[in-house]
Each structure stands twice: as structure tokens, then as C-alpha cells.
A protein has these predicted regions:
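Conserved, mostly hydrophobic/aromatic
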Residues: 109, 134, 182, 196, ...
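N-terminal amphipathic alpha-helix/helix-capping segment at the start of soluble metabolic enzymes
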Residues: 60-110, 222-234
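Glycine-rich phosphate-binding active-site loops on the catalytic face of alpha/beta enzymes
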Residues: 181-192, 263-273, 314-333
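Conserved anion-binding
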Residues: 181-257
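Alpha-helix-loop-beta-strand connector modules within alpha/beta enzyme cores
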Residues: 142-168, 172, 200-205, 231-233, ...
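C-terminal helical cap(s) of enzyme catalytic domains, especially alpha/beta-barrels
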Residues: 148, 191-205, 322-346
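Active-site mouth loops of central-metabolism enzymes
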Residues: 102-117, 160-164, 236-249
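Catalytic cores of alpha/beta
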Residues: 166-180, 184, 191-193, 248-257, ...
Length: 352
């Protein structure tokens, strides 16, 4: 009975001790992943140049003593920093740019209607210098293009594309997916030409945003010498198409835009927009003006493969994957082409 009587005070004591320990534990702050929670000077040590909390730093007018750009902030006078300079030993790693710099002829095979990686890769390994993935006249989406390019990024032909229009979203989709040749259609003015250049090139030459994309992946260009961000401006081939009379008038200024590698005399649309057919004096005059603009600016001159022997033309658009298949079969079969049997009845019988 004595034990039973003393048991309750002991239990009360244990309960009281437990509550005291819990209270003490609750009042002791746990370690935090936030360094500022355990180090009151963390902001000063990690961000020594940061503005004081809750105060106007005056940075719009006064720069830190070690800053290159002193005085009031003026974008027009801003000296671009060296963070993204390409190293002298990084070299040119785009085979198309290498050939164009030498003045050699380059050809682009057109992928018009397929979104199948196997067909794209067959074209990319057929012998062209680049693939002209058609996005102006085909309704495929950019996801399809990305899958095709990623299926064989280091094929013989580098991935290229004709975008639909001079637009930040359109061109940056192409660049972020890994395009090494950008063809811009229907450039009507110097302003449009500069806009196309701006969305293709990173600063300081252009205005391309530094985003993510498969272009940065190791399977694509993530491991190129010097790094993708620092070297793509001197590797991407930008071709601007002259397709209208207005574009022809501004062709010299368009060709002279820094970053434009070539201008393209669009054989079909120059006829479409001028009303004259190839070979007529008015048509040929327009082509010759584009020719003069390219050689005057020291840029390459592009056109259809039909013009591969025309003076000073060195880069060309070839036919589509469908035409390439037809040509390949014709070359392979020779005299056996179109020698199918001719039944007199049934779906294969000649129509009467």
C-alpha cells in the first residue's frame, strides 16, 4: 500500500520534467538551411556590394569604385564586359561556316513535309552541307523539329531551318533547339534585317536571350570548344532572303549588316512579287542588284541549286526529301525504272 500511495507523486514528477524538457526544446531554434538565420552578417559577407536593406543605394547615378562603367547609367555608353568573350583557340566548329569563309560552295537539302527522325537523318547523311528544315511553308511544330535534330545532331549535314518570319519567338526557338543555319524569308528592309540578326545573335552583337534548350546539351553543342554561349555568334550562319522589290532596293544595306553571312536571291518569289519570269530583262536586273549587294559587302550569295554555275553564287537550296527519294530511285534503277507489269484487269490495269 505504501508503494501505491507514493506512485502518484513520482508520476507527477516525471510528467513535470517531461513538460519542462519539451518547453525548453521548443524555445531552442533548430539549425536552418538559410545562412542568414544562423549568421546575422551573412548578407554582408555573401553580397558585399548589395544595396542596404530598405535604403536607396543611389546606383542609378553612382557606380562602385571598381566598376568599369562609371557615372550615371547610360545604355548608349555602356561598355560590354568580357564574361562571354570567345577564346582565341576556340576556333570555328560549324563546317558550313568554315566552307563559306573559304568561298567554297555549300548545299542545303530541304526537309519539307516529314517529321520523322529516320527520314531527316537519312537526308542529313546523304551528302548535303546543311539541312534546310522548312518552317515557312510547312505546318509542323517546333517539338517535331527538335526531335529530328536531336536524333542525329552530328550527321554530315548540320541542322538548319527557314523560319516563318522575322520574330524573336520564332528565331529563338530555332536557336535554342540547335540550329546552325538560320534562313530568314522576305526581308524587306534594313530594319527587318537587323531584327533577324538581333534575335539570332547573343549580345553584344544581338539581343538573343540566354535561355535553356537542347542546343546546350552535351549531345548537341554543349561540349564545343570554348562553350556554346561564347562561340555561337561566330559559328551560326545567318542567311537573309531578298524576295521583294522593296528588299532589292535595300539589298546593299541588308548585306552590310554585321552578323549576316549571306543574302539569298529568291528566284521564285522575286518573280512572284515583281511580275516577271526568270530570264526576262526586268527579272534579271533584280537578281543582278542582289548580286552586286553581296559582293559589295563581301558576303556570300545564295540561290536555288539551278544556279550553281551562275557567277559568284556559292550557297544553294536543293530539292525536298520527296524529290531526293525519286531521284535516288531513278539513279539506282536506271533502265529498270517504271517497267512494272501491266495487267489488263483490276486496279493496276491501264485506264480506258
Amino acid at each position: 500500500m505504501e508503494f501505491e500511495m507514493n506512485r502518484f507523486p513520482v508520476a507527477k514528477l516525471i510528467t513535470a520534467l517531461g513538460l519542462t524538457m519539451l518547453s525548453a526544446h521548443a524555445q531552442t531554434p533548430s539549425p536552418s538551411a538559410d545562412p542568414a538565420a544562423n549568421n546575422p552578417d551573412a548578407a554582408k559577407t555573401q553580397f558585399p556590394l548589395a544595396a542596404p536593406a530598405g535604403e536607396d543605394s543611389g546606383a542609378i547615378s553612382i557606380a562602385p569604385p571598381a566598376a568599369v562603367n562609371q557615372g550615371p547609367l547610360d545604355p548608349a555608353k555602356w561598355k560590354y564586359g568580357p564574361a562571354y568573350d570567345s577564346q582565341p583557340d576556340s576556333g570555328i566548329w560549324n563546317p558550313v561556316m568554315i566552307k563559306m569563309m573559304k568561298g567554297e560552295k555549300v548545299t542545303g537539302g530541304t526537309v519539307l513535309s516529314t517529321d520523322t527522325p529516320a527520314t531527316y537523318c537519312a537526308m542529313a547523311n546523304a551528302g548535303y552541307d546543311f539541312i534546310w528544315t522548312e518552317m515557312q511553308h510547312d505546318p509542323r511544330d517546333w517539338d517535331s523539329v527538335g526531335r529530328m535534330w536531336k536524333a542525329c545532331p552530328h550527321a554530315k549535314a548540320v541542322p538548319g531551318v527557314r523560319v516563318a518570319y522575322t520574330d524573336e519567338r520564332e528565331i529563338q526557338h530555332a536557336m535554342d533547339l540547335g540550329a546552325l543555319v538560320i534562313v530568314v524569308p522576305t526581308v524587306r528592309s534594313v530594319e527587318e534585317g537587323k531584327a533577324a540578326r538581333d534575335w539570332t545573335m547573343y549580345p553584344p552583337l544581338g539581343k538573343r536571350s540566354l535561355g535553356a534548350g537542347q542546343a546546350f546539351e552535351p549531345e548537341m553543342w554543349g561540349n564545343v570548344p570554348g562553350g556554346y554561349r561564347n562561340t555561337i555568334n561566330k559559328n551560326v550562319v545567318l542567311i537573309e532572303m531578298i524576295e521583294t522589290v522593296e528588299g532589292v532596293k535595300d539589298a546593299r544595306e541588308i548585306a552590310a549588316i554585321p552578323g549576316v553571312a549571306a543574302i539569298f536571291a529568291a528566284s521564285g518569289d522575286l518573280g512572284n512579287f515583281s511580275g516577271y519570269k526568270m530570264g526576262t530583262p526586268d527579272y534579271e536586273r533584280l537578281i543582278n542588284i542582289v548580286h552586286d549587294a553581296a559582293i559589295g559587302a563581301g558576303k556570300r550569295l545564295c540561290g536555288p541549286f539551278l544556279w550553281r554555275d551562275r557567277p559568284d553564287f556559292t550557297c544553294f537550296q536543293n530539292a525536298t526529301e520527296v524529290t531526293a527519294i525519286q531521284r535516288g530511285v531513278a539513279d539506282e534503277l536506271g533502265p529498270l525504272k517504271d517497267t512494272q507489269g501491266k495487267p489488263e484487269v483490276g486496279p493496276y490495269a491501264p485506264r480506258k
